[in-house]
Design a protein with these regions (language model features):
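Conserved beta-strand-loop surface patch within small alpha/beta domains used
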Residues: 1-128, 137-223
Length: 223
């Protein structure tokens, strides 16, 4: 158990979000097919590039018997006009040196050091916005161990977790609510960042595209 420690490595002050416009016009919203009668209010909206989505899914499918995972990097942002906090996830970092099995995943100290060094060296302008891992044949949910990892490794209110189930082609984000509470029973969808006339890459069966007045029909193609 000596290698299963939590490191509190120094990082720049990233509590202040980047001021920028929320890219709703350049994204397609994917929502869970089944939602609560009174939907939860997440602290942040998640925007994910197609490249980041593909890399996370590809890594998730690399081992269909054991859990795999890693970190998600990008930007924590705020749109003052819309009064919305949101994340831009554009970088996926697969974790090396993990302690993993069919029903568990642990980021070891070596894994954390390697990921922090890689992030600092190659992506110094980006922030650690969350983590992802798989639940092979178990569904999209947040276990008590997942909750412990999230609380201790990703304590900032705006950091999120993505769970991928590679066998059933499903996935979802776990996001703290505006009151700071993380409901481990409920997952959220995300906004897929899409270039004009580019087809959607999302194929998770538990999510469906949702269009609203902020999404121009000419900007996205769903297959």
């Amino acid at each position: 158990m000596d290698n299963k420690i939590v490191l509190h490595l120094p990082q720049e002050d990233d509590t202040v979000p980047h001021q920028t416009r929320i890219p709703t016009h350049h994204a397609l919203q994917w929502s869970p097919r089944y939602t609560l009668e009174e939907p939860l209010k997440p602290l942040v909206k998640v925007f994910m590039t197609q490249n980041a989505y593909i890399r996370a899914v590809a890594h998730g499918g690399s081992d269909l018997d054991n859990e795999v995972g890693g970190w998600m990097a990008g930007k924590y942002c705020y749109d003052q006009e819309a009064q919305e906090y949101f994340l831009i996830i554009d970088t996926i970092l697969a974790a090396p040196y993990t302690d993993q099995g069919a029903a568990h995943l642990t980021f070891t100290s070596d894994s954390q050091i390697a990921l922090f060094d890689f992030l600092e060296h190659y992506y110094p302008e980006k922030q650690l916005v969350g983590w992802y891992h798989t639940h092979p044949r178990m569904g999209v949910f947040f276990s008590s161990w997942d909750e412990w990892l999230h609380k201790n490794f990703f304590p900032k209110p705006w950091q999120v977790a993505l769970v991928i189930e590679p066998h059933s082609s499903t996935g979802g984000f776990f996001i703290r609510q505006k009151n700071g509470v993380l409901d481990t029973r409920v997952y959220f969808g995300f906004h897929e960042l899409i270039n004009k006339n580019t087809q959607s890459k999302v194929f998770w069966k538990n999510l469906e595209p949702k269009r609203d007045m902020n999404t121009r029909e000419t900007e996205v193609l769903v297959v």
